[in-house]
């Protein structure tokens, strides 16, 4: 962390957990295990010490947004239009974005019992593999140019306008967009958008995805720790794919482990690390909140925009 974070207040985990005194976790260990991503590490104590204070903070932002919306409607002499409270979550591949997103979805639903809380990932807005292959971009998958940004921004604009919107569905098992399958959203109360690219400058240089966000989170960690998590996850995916020939990773299951690790290290260095250093990490100061993870996946520091 450097002067890049001069606009953030650094908060230790010890101080953060004291900002919210509720000790009831709102979910069971079994529920937490079911939403935890492969090779991630989180327990009930993390929920109580980190995520319950975060839910309380999000509630503060939501009340402020509602008050501003009400005041603007009075000023403009217009009726208030109900719009989703949109939360953007970004960070590297294998850093734990999906676990955080699913956990927030569940906790928000438990604390706002009459509200609808939806989750969408930007993976669904990747171009299909056939398009990437046609344009010789398959090895650039995950980089900014591999996303259909026009479709993604149109989706966000439609959702933010309170209208029904649909998003393509991505499958990590087939490593591609699922044909003829859509995820539909009808004016939810909360919408969580998770992806490596949610803070990136768009190709027209005029509009950011984050322009649509009411709150935003960046999951941070040292790159050598993320690399280790990525390699561990890759080996776990190979184990799962051994008995599923339709799985994308099945093609790598016949490799000796040392060759599989060497392959994963090459992918990390030439694709994921480059993407992280050039396009993902430089955007973290656009987040409202940064959650920093230590080597054991545990959040040890929190940075809140002043």
From Swiss-Prot:
Keywords: ATP-binding, Coenzyme A biosynthesis, Cytoplasm, Kinase, Nucleotide-binding, Transferase. Disulfide bonds: none annotated. ATP binds at residues 91-98. Signal peptide: none annotated. It is found in: Cytoplasm. One of its GO terms (molecular function) is ATP binding. The keyword Ion transport does not apply. NCBIfam families: panK_bact. This is Pantothenate kinase.
């Amino acid at each position: 962390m450097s002067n890049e974070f001069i606009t953030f207040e650094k908060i230790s985990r010890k101080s953060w957990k004291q900002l919210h005194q509720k000790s009831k976790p709102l979910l069971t260990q079994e529920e937490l295990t079911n939403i935890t991503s492969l090779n991630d590490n989180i327990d009930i104590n993390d929920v109580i010490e980190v995520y319950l204070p975060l839910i309380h903070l999000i509630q503060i932002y939501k009340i402020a947004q509602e008050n501003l919306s009400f005041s603007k409607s009075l000023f403009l002499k217009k009726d208030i239009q109900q719009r989703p409270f949109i939360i953007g979550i970004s960070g590297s591949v294998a850093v734990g974005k999906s676990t955080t997103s699913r956990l927030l979805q569940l906790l928000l639903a438990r604390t706002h019992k009459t509200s609808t809380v939806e989750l969408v990932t930007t993976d669904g807005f990747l171009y299909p593999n056939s398009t990437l292959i046609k344009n010789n971009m398959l090895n650039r998958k995950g980089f900014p140019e591999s996303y259909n940004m026009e479709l993604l921004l149109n989706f966000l604009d439609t959702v933010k306008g309170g209208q029904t919107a649909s998003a393509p569905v991505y499958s990590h098992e087939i490593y591609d967009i699922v044909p003829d399958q859509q995820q539909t959203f009808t004016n939810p109360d909360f919408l969580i958008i998770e992806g490596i690219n949610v803070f990136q400058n768009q190709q027209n240089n005029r509009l950011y995805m984050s322009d649509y966000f009411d709150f935003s989170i960046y999951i941070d960690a040292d790159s050598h720790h993320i690399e280790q998590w990525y390699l561990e996850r890759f080996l776990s995916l190979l184990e799962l794919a051994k008995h599923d020939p339709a799985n994308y990773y099945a093609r790598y299951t016949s490799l000796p482990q040392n060759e599989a690790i060497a392959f994963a290290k090459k992918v990390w260095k030439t694709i994921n690390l480059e993407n992280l250093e050039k396009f993902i990490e430089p955007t973290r100061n656009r987040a409202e909140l940064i959650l920093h993870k230590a080597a054991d996946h545990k959040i040890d520091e929190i940075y809140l925009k002043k």
